[in-house]
Amino acid sequence: MSETLLLQTAKLIVDYGLKDLGYHYVILDDCWSAGRDASAGNSLIANSTKFPNGMAAVADNLHALGLGFGMYSSAGKYTCGGYAGSQGFETVDANTFASWGVDYLKYDNCYNKGQAGNQLLSYTRRVSTASFWELVTNCPRYETMAKALNETGRPILYSLCNW
């Protein structure tokens, strides 16, 4: 994946009329990161070879096409591809995503120190039974990122991937 390929694909979504049919988000999955910048509060940084203009420029270009920009991270120490995950950096990462103009976050569940989820997991803590409540109280990592995203003031659609 690269900035060029992502933006070419986005343009095709518009040119082929898919945007008019309801396609809105262009989501960049794993392997976009170059790690964290310790001199900038440990914020995530994009791979400058793949994304030479940076993520804010990618978002600006997608928004100019009338599309939303989706990013990827993981609730663990690493992403599934072995890049820097958000565990312990939720507030930093949420603020970074918001500053880039991200509209959607796919949040995976790799390298989470054994904090496996289950098919009934919900970060909202809205429950209908006591047994379900017991299941969701063991998974604060999703709620931590949800809170961090909400505190940015930018509306970011939050999508959970529960491996």
Kindly give the residue locations of the regions a language model identified.
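An acidic-aromatic substrate-binding cleft motif
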Residues: 1
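Aromatic-lined carbohydrate-binding/catalytic grooves of carbohydrate-active enzymes
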Residues: 5-115, 129-135
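Substrate-binding and catalytic surfaces of secreted/luminal carbohydrate-active proteins
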Residues: 11-15, 121-129, 133-163
